[in-house]
Amino acid sequence: MSITAINVRNQFRGTVKEIIEGPVVSEVDVITRSGDVVTSVITTRSVKDLGLEVGREVVALVKSTEVSIATL
């Protein structure tokens, strides 16, 4: 899958470093190409729906009020 257009300006490619799953929400740590870690709290259902797992390449999308993750 590729993203063809999106209105989020701040995008960071990276790799899922760690997932801490909870019953409702989960914490996903993404290590970027520069070595920085971006952490996102998303629903556990989204973790499963996106097929997120440690080592998976993702894009962290940072908007002023939220951080979203899109799979590649």
Language-model features, listed with the residues they occupy:
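Non-catalytic connector elements of ABC transporters
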Residues: 1-72
